Each structure stands twice: as C-alpha cells, then as structure tokens.
C-alpha cells in the first residue's frame, strides 16, 4: 500500500451506542486515480481535483485516532494505507490498538460462507449507504462492530483482552507459536492421538 494513495478518508467513533462522525474528506492523491479504483468507488479525478492532499489532513487523521481503537473491516489493509500516508506526510504514526471486524466475524459468525463487509452487513440486516466509499463503509463497519461485540460477549469475550484472544486464536501466528513450542524432534506423523 505504500505506493498506493488514499482518495477518501472517513473516521467515525462509536460512543455510547451511537455512531458519531469524526472526520470525512475526499483526498487529492496527487496523481491520476486508476480506472479500477474509480470503477469500484465512483471517485474520479474531477471529484478530487479541489480536495486537500492527505498531508493537509494528516494532523487531523492522527488526532482522530489518538486514544481510540482503530477498527476496520480488514484492519491490516486499511492501516497499511493510513500509516503509509501519515509517514509520507511526515506525521508521526500513532501506536493504536487495532481490532479487525473480519477476524472478529470469523470467530463470531463461523457459519457464514464469507466474511466480507457485504456478507456480514447482510447477516445483521445493516444497510450500507455508499458501499466502497469511505464514509459509507465506516458507518457500516461501526454498525457491524456493535453487533459483533454483542455476539462476542455471548461467547465470553467482553473485555479487550478477551476480544484480542478471540480474534487471534487459531491464526497463523498462534499456530506458528504453538509449533515453536514443540521439540525439534517432534514428528507429527508418528503422533498417536487418544481414541
């Protein structure tokens, strides 16, 4: 994502059960928008012509994220864009806790065939206004987050630590960690499991 550019930024906060707009702006990427991105988002070069470059928004973006949890549907992907833009703008990248609603949906909704934002919002009956636009996706993700958190609580994950444990359980990192605890001489093919 370091070579790619943001064309729109939106942040909302979930406060007291309400979704509160924090920041929203089109962003001038300083170069032509690839046609596939325009096709997906509807954002054109003409739309961003008078928009601020990310560098002008960077202090506001950083401020919007401080003392908050960065939540996104595929958080690692979105964070790679945000952190790259902040770095490019010379703005310090805040160390923020992150929560990925895709990972949370995998644990809370294991029966769904897919965990895309479209599938998860459909499951919860959440309507997305402006799909593939930053503000529409941010609001939809906030709505999904509220429902996922309620469902996670029924699974015993009510605290930040429990949510982190739930979303990382069984991931590649956890599997690698478990494997690293095994003796080097361990042969999984010779292991007899109890009947």
Could you describe each region identified by the protein language model?
Residues 142-195:
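Acidic two-metal-ion nuclease catalytic site recognized across multiple nuclease folds
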């Amino acid at each position: 994502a370091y070579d790619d550019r943001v064309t729109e930024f939106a942040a909302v906060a979930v406060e007291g059960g309400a979704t509160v707009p924090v920041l929203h702006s089109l962003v001038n990427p300083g170069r032509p928008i690839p046609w596939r991105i325009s096709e997906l988002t509807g954002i054109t070069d003409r739309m961003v012509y008078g928009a601020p470059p990310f560098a002008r928004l960077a202090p506001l973006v950083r401020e919007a994220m401080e003392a908050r949890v960065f939540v996104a549907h595929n958080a690692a992907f979105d964070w790679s864009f945000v952190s790259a833009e902040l770095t490019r703008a010379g703005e310090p990248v805040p160390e923020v806790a992150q929560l990925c609603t895709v990972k949370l949906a995998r644990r809370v909704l294991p029966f769904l065939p897919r965990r895309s934002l479209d599938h998860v919002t459909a499951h919860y009956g959440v309507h997305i206004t402006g799909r593939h636009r930053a503000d529409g996706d941010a609001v939809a993700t906030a709505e999904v987050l509220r429902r996922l958190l309620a469902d996670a609580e029924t699974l015993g994950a009510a605290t930040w630590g429990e949510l982190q444990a739930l979303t990382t359980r069984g991931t590649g990192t956890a599997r690698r960690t478990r494997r690293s605890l095994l003796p080097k001489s361990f042969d999984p093919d010779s292991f007899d499991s109890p009947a």
